[in-house]
Amino acid sequence: MKYTLTRANPDADQYPLQDRQIVTDPLEEEVNKNVFMTRLEDVLHTAVNWGRKNSLWPFNFGTSCCYVEYATTLTGVHDLSRFGAEVIRASPRQADLMIVAGTCFVKMAPVIQRLYEQMLEPKWVISMGACANSGGMYDIYSVVQGVDKIIPVDVYVPGCPPRPEALIQALMLLQDQIQLERRPLSAVIGDDLQPVYKPKMMPERDRKNAQRIAVKNLRSMDEIK
């Protein structure tokens, strides 16, 4: 008499000859529909970041001609209150957003750095204009070749000077970054030197590269306004 050994298949049906349909637990289905399971830390970070990105308080100061466009952005025509950034503060201790609008001179660099240090955490910086980004056309001894040489910058706005719409787009990009950040929920609890995670955002130049290359019919100089 011959014997054959067959290895058990754990994925096989328990009752292969039974035609009865196997359904999931109805209680489990109701729980999945009505109960949202997540970590409390993720919920708190999402809620706190939502509040931070929609209540930015810009610091009202300017270093050069780009401040004219910055002040134009604050007018009612552009309605900056849609983004929760209409509360302009004249004190660095009451602001959390610094917009460096214009040329950063060597004599002005210590002042900007001091003002940045006086701002409380969390704080962000927008570099507005070619001069603030890289010195612009002033490649001379008296101009700092980029404000990021003295303070960290989150968003760069190109242009000389940039239009108010460009600054609004920079504000929206900063809001996207703030939503993905992970900061200590409280400076009272835990160590003061807790790490701060800032996501690495893709530059708009790279994100819209394929869209620009796909354009074949360019407008003439007379049509550009």
Curated annotation (Swiss-Prot):
What this protein catalyses is: a quinone + NADH + 5 H(+)(in) = a quinol + NAD(+) + 4 H(+)(out)
Q: Which domain of life is it from?
A: Bacteria
An example Gene Ontology biological process? electron transport coupled proton transport
Keyword tags: 4Fe-4S, Cell inner membrane, Cell membrane, Iron, Iron-sulfur, Membrane, Metal-binding, NAD, Quinone, Translocase, Transport, Ubiquinone
Leader sequence range is: none
Cofactor descriptive note: Binds 1 [4Fe-4S] cluster.
Coarsely, its chief localization is: membrane
Membrane topology listed for this record: Peripheral membrane protein
Compartment(s) of residence? Cell inner membrane
List residues binding [4Fe-4S] cluster.
C65, C66, C131, C160
What EC identifiers does the entry list? 7.1.1.-
Query: Which Gene Ontology terms cover its molecular function?
Result: 4 iron, 4 sulfur cluster binding; iron ion binding; NADH dehydrogenase (ubiquinone) activity; NADH:ubiquinone reductase (non-electrogenic) activity; quinone binding
Name the coenzymes or cofactors required: [4Fe-4S] cluster
Q: Which GO terms describe its cellular component?
A: plasma membrane; respiratory chain complex I
Quaternary structure per UniProt? NDH-1 is composed of 14 different subunits. Subunits NuoB, C, D, E, F, and G constitute the peripheral sector of the complex.
Task: Spell out the family assignment given in the record's similarity comment.
Answer: Belongs to the complex I 20 kDa subunit family.
Instruction: Relate the protein's function as given in its record.
Output: NDH-1 shuttles electrons from NADH, via FMN and iron-sulfur (Fe-S) centers, to quinones in the respiratory chain. The immediate electron acceptor for the enzyme in this species is believed to be ubiquinone. Couples the redox reaction to proton translocation (for every two electrons transferred, four hydrogen ions are translocated across the cytoplasmic membrane), and thus conserves the redox energy in a proton gradient.
Which protein, by its recorded name, is this?
NADH-quinone oxidoreductase subunit B
